Amino acid sequence: MIQIEQIRNYFPVQIRGNSGFDKHILKEYLQLMILDYLSSTPNIQKMAFIGGTNLRLVKGIDRFSEDLDFDCKNLSKDEFIEMTNGVIQFLERSGLRVEAKDKKNPKLTAFRRNIHFPELLFDLGLSGHKEERFLIKVESQYQGIAYPPVITNIKGYGFFFPFPVPSDGVLCSMKIAAMLARAKGRDFYDLMFL
């Protein structure tokens, strides 16, 4: 079982001493568990790790991110479901209660799975509400840009594993496209960071 006290020790005093960061710290730890698992699967050949969580875990941006986003050129919906089912089985074998709760969204062009962790926050003492929602979204979509991924080592919380990512130039162009398409503040922040 995950121990929040152990995870906190990987962070500077300013963060680990502030319980307001605990849910973010936990989410980031679970994201790293998932990425570490995926790095050892055959699907790794068809994906590149992108988005805000890439900036956090690979580049060191000083903001937490919610989702795991992948650029997957030749990954079918069935392969995506199989891949995320593997993630769920891995998390269950790691001692976590996990459920996939998928919502139909006709506007969504990406493949998405919402991986819920029922009662995890309550069990860890991070919430007084058993039913408080805690989830990680895994999304995959082909970005329409042909590029050779770069293998980088992702490290943190005691994890160390290789993962394909876009080059800095490609990642920057993806962030510019996101900024122009949706105009969210985090996209401007991310672009200034790059």
PLM features: what roles do these ranges have?
Residues 54-56, 105-106, 143-145:
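Short, solvent-exposed loop/turn segments at secondary-structure junctions
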Residues 1-47:
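Helical scaffold of the NTase/Pol beta-like nucleotidyltransferase catalytic core
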Residues 33, 82-89:
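Long, highly charged amphipathic alpha-helices
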Residues 30, 88-134, 170-171:
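Conserved catalytic core of two-metal-ion nucleotidyltransferases
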Residues 52, 59-80:
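Catalytic metal-binding acidic patch
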Residues 46-54:
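Short gly/ser-rich loop at a beta-strand->alpha-helix junction or flexible surface loop bordering the NTP-binding
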